[in-house]
């Protein structure tokens, strides 16, 4: 299996979640071993994707440096993970990614439009060699050795619509598009009102998120899946794992995980070479992972 980029440049315009202003996103091909590189053309700032580029994880995954930042990259990166893309230039003209409909499906469609191109270098993946875990009280995230990429996410909210939910997802590109990509982010009306009073979440609407009051969903169309909330948490986790710069071969498990815990997990995984190996797909003992991108 070879490294991947896109065949041609593509672009789209969407609203930024926090500023509520239009953001232009352009994707450009890159050569083998270039990695995923974000670029803010409004301030001529380049940020190679890696855990060392992460500067904030409180409300979203944010990368940056001394010149500036780019927020809410996780929904886009989940699509990058799902399509097995290794090398890509991601150009935006503001400090956040467009939120689109609050899921990853618009980014999947954009990658479909661009087309996938295989490059003449072997694809490298991170293979988990021993269990790594991060906890915060009852909350946890962990990665375990596995012959395939799996995501098992459980959540519990004191809300009549959400309650306890789970999603177990055996990764494949087609499965992601069918089962995960359309799951939207969600928020509570009282929290959104507070954030907007702080000039945040100014772009949040029922067109790009599931809104909830204390008792019900506010979106007239309802949910896309019975467990859409848990599915979106898997989507987020996939995007956060992609911050490592590579697809990860391992079993991800979580209860009430967050962007912060996910970031701590990838950082802990990569902090000790005994935790993982960086291998070409051909060096893997299992062919299951390669088939998942078919």
Pin down the residues of each PLM region.
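C-terminal regulatory domains involved in ligand/effector binding and gene-expression control
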Residues: 1-86, 91-294
């Amino acid at each position: 299996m070879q490294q991947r980029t896109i065949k041609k440049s593509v672009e789209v315009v969407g609203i930024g979640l926090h500023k509520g202003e239009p953001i232009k996103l352009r994707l450009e091909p890159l050569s083998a071993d270039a990695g995923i590189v974000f670029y803010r053309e409004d301030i001529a700032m380049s940020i190679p994707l890696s855990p060392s580029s992460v500067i904030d994880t409180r409300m979203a995954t944010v990368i940056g440096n001394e010149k500036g930042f780019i927020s809410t990259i996780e929904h886009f990166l989940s699509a990058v993970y799902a399509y097995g893309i290794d090398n890509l230039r991601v150009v935006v003209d503001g400090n956040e990614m467009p939120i689109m409909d609050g899921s990853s499906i618009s980014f999947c469609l954009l990658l479909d439009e661009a087309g996938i191109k295989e490059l003449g270098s072997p694809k490298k993946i991170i293979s988990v060699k021993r269990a790594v875990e991060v906890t915060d009280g009852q909350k946890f995230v962990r990665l375990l050795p596995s012959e395939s990429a799996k995501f098992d996410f459980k959540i519990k909210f004191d809300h009549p619509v959400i309650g306890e939910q789970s999603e177990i997802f055996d990764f494949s590109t087609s499965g992601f598009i069918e089962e995960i990509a359309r799951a939207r982010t969600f928020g509570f009306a009282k929290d959104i009102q507070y954030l907007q009073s702080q000039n945040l979440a100014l772009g949040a609407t029922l067109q790009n998120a599931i809104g909830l009051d204390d008792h019900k969903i506010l979106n007239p169309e309802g949910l896309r899946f019975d467990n859409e909330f848990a599915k979106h948490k898997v989507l987020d986790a996939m995007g956060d794992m992609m911050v490592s710069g590579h697809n990860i071969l391992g079993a991800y498990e979580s209860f009430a995980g967050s962007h912060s815990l996910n970031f701590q997990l990838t950082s802990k995984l990569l902090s000790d070479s005994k935790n993982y190996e960086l291998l070409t797909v051909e060096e893997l003992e299992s062919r299951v992972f390669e088939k998942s991108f078919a």
